[in-house]
Swiss-Prot record:
Assigned GO CC terms: cytoplasm
Locations listed in the record: Cytoplasm
Gene: recX
PANTHER family xrefs: REGULATORY PROTEIN RECX FAMILY PROTEIN (PTHR33602:SF1)
Annotated S-S bridges: none
Protein's name according to its UniProt entry: Regulatory protein RecX
Amino acid sequence: MHHRFTPPMMSCKDTAIQLLSRRDHGQYELRQKLTVKGYASQDIESAMHFCLEHGYLDDLRYAKSQIRQHVGKGHGERRIRQELSLKQVSDSVVENAFAEEPQDWFELAKSVAMKKFNGVKAKEQKEYAKQVRFLQYRGFSFEQIRYALSDEA
């Protein structure tokens, strides 16, 4: 008979550090993960305070990382802002992150459109509407979409 070795449960702080060593997390996201793992709220707050104090947890760094990741996926500013809002990153942190990670949203919209539609301009209104919807879903503004789908783009 084999007995499975079960390691002692890690402390909340150690779990938080382990999660943060893999990738950046926002405060809300880390708190949620620790709660799901069953740690007491007092232990979670203590671990969060430790991680903030030692620079392991930083919402600005997390937001900038998320911006870079979403831009790499071809997402526009609106979609990225919505995702960060869902992760409960504060508006001021989001504004600072966008200021520190400048993007040319018009050119990004154009390159996403080129990749998706192979540079083919819509000949019919129905096809044009389909292209617009795709870019709207990706989080681009109408001005950016118009630029991306225009002939001078």
